[in-house]
């Protein structure tokens, strides 16, 4: 029987260099990360997703890779990596890593060989044109920062394609040699103990755009089947988590019959979730949940609030996007790429823990696998003085002491500045203070994670949206193996109540609530405080 561990997983995303510095050089490392696994264990994490940790010039937070088979020396050694994997395993945590193979760094030896010699075997590993292509600005990913998707290389005397920054030349994934190398990279890290990959930029990875070939690509998604087949052969329980900002209509091509991507991030639902939060009504999120297709096979959606990138609102209408900007980032400096916000969750709510807790409870109640960005569990803010998406990647705030407990290095040697001023500074927001106090934000989130882990109905089961006649409430019913959990969330800033008109419910047992007196009134009415939430198990303990 397949090990579908991801169905009830709690995924925690870590940028290693910003998490914990063990050797005092100012950059987080694998030894430091291993030393802080107890924090993740207290939170209830079962899977750690690592942002790129490979050798890199680090012009794009490590997503510009110069060696796929190594560790950035500032982060440690392969030995440190394996020790971290074992330490995580001892705590029941799996590890998945970023697979960034749409492009390389322009400093990668493959690209250096390709540009130096038109007869190099690596020349066709990239996408070249002798003449300047038409529409070199068509399809820019980073408006306002990126100037084109083709650049001229003087050494090669040719144009190369880069869907992202010009220092990230695209690999030619129609080349069988490139595809074989991708499988080799996967096999290497699987052998070192990882449990799968978060696959970066999947729509661009499989897109044959710009490639000149006599054999047109009939189905670009077939590449995903190749990757899945290799993964299943090497490590059957490993997963593929796709970063794919796609419509629901496109989703079946990514899941297929369970033989492509294991999970896909629900970007559509994420944007509708924030539109709901901005408007104070559950209606947009309710509509997206109703429209979201059920993955075939054993596929799963991955759900999230924030991540290491901008909050991408590009799929909303201009009016809807402006509503989100007005609610969560009215200053133009908070906005980015004409489509998103470069803010962390806590600062978007101005530190309002009532609304933050409701948002986290909502995340964990959504059908799918929840993904948490490091630091959000303690309510960290962002540093808007940093460029672009770097604003949300500041070092983890561990304590109120020097450098927030992140590093003993001098302040000017830190990989990124710590937030040391204002209400979100490490003097006020840190893990040490919160873990010591049972009524802290961290413990509230840990309690929610515990409720989610004890509710496989949410991860495994089918979900039904219950109509209680109020657009400001989202009430979900999740069923699995004869058990049922009902979750309710109030998007309004005023108290709400509702009745469950269901003859199959004989008893409701509160699992989680923001109310100190419990959500169930004497007449069976369920009451929610402003921005309140509750989780209820139907008919007693889970059987």
Could you say what each language-model-derived stretch is?
Residues 1-543:
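Active-site and adjacent substrate-binding regions of carbohydrate-active enzymes
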């Amino acid at each position: 029987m397949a090990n579908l561990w991801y169905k009830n997983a709690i995924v925690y995303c870590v940028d290693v260099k910003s998490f914990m510095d063990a050797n005092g050089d100012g950059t987080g490392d694998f030894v430091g990360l291993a030393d802080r696994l107890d924090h993740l264990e207290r939170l209830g994490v079962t899977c750690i997703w690592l942002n790129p940790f490979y050798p890199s010039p680090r012009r794009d937070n490590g997503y510009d890779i110069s060696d796929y088979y190594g560790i950035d020396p500032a982060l440690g050694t392969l030995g440190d990596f394996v020790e971290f994997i074992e330490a995580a395993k001892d705590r029941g945590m799996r590890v998945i890593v970023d697979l960034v193979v749409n492009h390389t760094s322009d400093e990668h030896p493959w690209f250096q060989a390709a540009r130096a010699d038109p007869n190099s075997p690596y020349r066709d590993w990239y996408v070249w044109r002798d003449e300047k292509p038409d529409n070199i600005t068509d399809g820019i990913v980073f408006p306002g920062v990126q100037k084109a998707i083709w650049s001229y290389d003087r050494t090669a005397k040719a144009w190369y394609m880069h869907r992202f920054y010009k220092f990230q030349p695209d690999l030619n994934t129609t080349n069988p040699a490139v595809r074989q190398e991708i499988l080799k990279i996967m096999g290497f890290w699987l052998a070192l103990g990882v449990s799968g990959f978060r696959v970066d930029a999947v729509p661009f990875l499989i897109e044959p755009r710009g490639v000149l070939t006599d054999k047109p690509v009939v189905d670009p998604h077939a590449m995903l089947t190749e990757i899945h087949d290799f993964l299943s052969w090497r490590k059957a329980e490993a997963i593929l988590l796709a970063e794919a900002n796609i419509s629901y209509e496109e989703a079946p091509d990514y899941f297929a019959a369970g033989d492509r991507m294991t999970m896909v991030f629900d970007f559509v639902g994420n944007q509708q979730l924030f539109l709901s939060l901005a408007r104070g009504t559950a209606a947009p999120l309710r509509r997206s949940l109703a429209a979201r297709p059920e993955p075939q096979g054993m596929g799963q959606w991955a759900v999230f609030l924030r991540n290491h990138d901008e909050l991408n609102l590009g799929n909303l209408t201009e009016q809807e996007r402006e509503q989100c900007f007005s609610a969560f980032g009215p200053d133009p400096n908070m906005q980015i790429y004409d489509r998103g916000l470069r803010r962390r969750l806590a600062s978007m709510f101005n530190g309002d823990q009532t609304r933050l807790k409701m948002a986290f409870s909502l995340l964990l109640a959504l059908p799918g696998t929840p993904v948490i960005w490091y630091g959000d569990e303690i309510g960290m803010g962002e540093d808007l003085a940093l460029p672009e998406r770097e604003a949300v990647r500041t070092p983890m705030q561990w304590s109120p002491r020097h450098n927030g407990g992140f590093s003993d290095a001098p302040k000017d040697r830190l990989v990124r500045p710590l937030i040391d001023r204002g209400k979100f500074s490490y003097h006020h927001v840190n893990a040490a203070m919160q873990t010591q106090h049972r009524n802290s934000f961290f413990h509230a989130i840990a309690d929610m994670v515990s409720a989610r882990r004890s509710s496989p109905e949410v991860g495994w089961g089918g979900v039904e949206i219950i109509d209680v006649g109020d657009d400001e409430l989202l009430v979900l019913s999740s069923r699995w193996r004869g058990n049922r959990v009902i979750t309710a969330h109030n998007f309004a800033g005023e108290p709400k109540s509702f009745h469950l008109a269901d003859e199959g419910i004989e008893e409701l047992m509160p699992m989680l609530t923001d109310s100190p007196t419990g959500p169930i009134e004497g007449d069976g009415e369920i009451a929610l405080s402003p921005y309140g939430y509750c989780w209820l198990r139907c008919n007693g303990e889970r059987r």
